[in-house]
Amino acid sequence: MSVLRSLLTAGVLASGLLWSLNGITATPAAQASDDRYEVTQQRNPDAACLDCHKPDTEGMHGKHASVINPNNKLPVTCTNCHGQPSPQHREGVKDVMRFNEPMYKVGEQNSVCMSCHLPEQLQKAFWPHDVHVTKVACASCHSLHPQQDTMQTLSDKGRIKICVDCHSDQRTNPNFNPASVPLLKEQP
């Protein structure tokens, strides 16, 4: 055993001597640079959703298609608003947020919108936001995926007509549920 240990020690010493004779030296490490790198997504995060929900593969339309999510500073994706689907989603399980559906309470639906659209800004933009925020789903009046939100193109007269139509239904139907107003119902 001592012969083996002697040979091993001699080998280590010989290799150290060989390196020193060949001029191998250590060089200082390069200074850390101030370069900043930006993380880019390698795949479309909406690809799985678009397989079934947008067969034309145009992707998300309208204002939400080109904005940055203020919460994570990344482009808005399907899951930002609709949530993460379960593995059973492709089999038809309704496990993501479907706006303007009675199965979700107004507060649940609107809390998704309010995570980016601050109530103070909405209140300044148009006073009915303040009045209806807890009673009517945002999707009752606003389209989510068209090229242009219908409410943005309506004249004041058109907006008043929507108010009158909805409030007329409310007066004539005691079971009226403002969360299920089908003005601009989104199709899956």
UniProtKB/Swiss-Prot annotation:
Q: Which residues bind heme 1?
A: 49, 52-53
The superkingdom of the source organism is: Bacteria
Which Pfam families does the record cross-reference, listed alphabetically? Answer: Cytochrom_c_NrfB-like
Tell me where the signal peptide lies: 1-32
**Per UniProt, where does heme 2 bind?**
78, 81-82
State where heme 3 binds.
113, 116-117
A single GO BP term for this record reads: anaerobic electron transport chain
Which InterPro entries is this protein grouped with?
Cyt_c_NrfB (IPR017564), Cytochrom_c_NrfB-like_dom (IPR053875), Multihaem_cyt_sf (IPR036280), Multiheme_Cytochr_ET (IPR051829)
Has UniProt tagged this entry with the keyword Electron transport? yes
Pathways involved: Energy metabolism; nitrogen metabolism
Q: What does this protein do?
A: Plays a role in nitrite reduction.
Recorded protein name is Cytochrome c-type protein NrfB
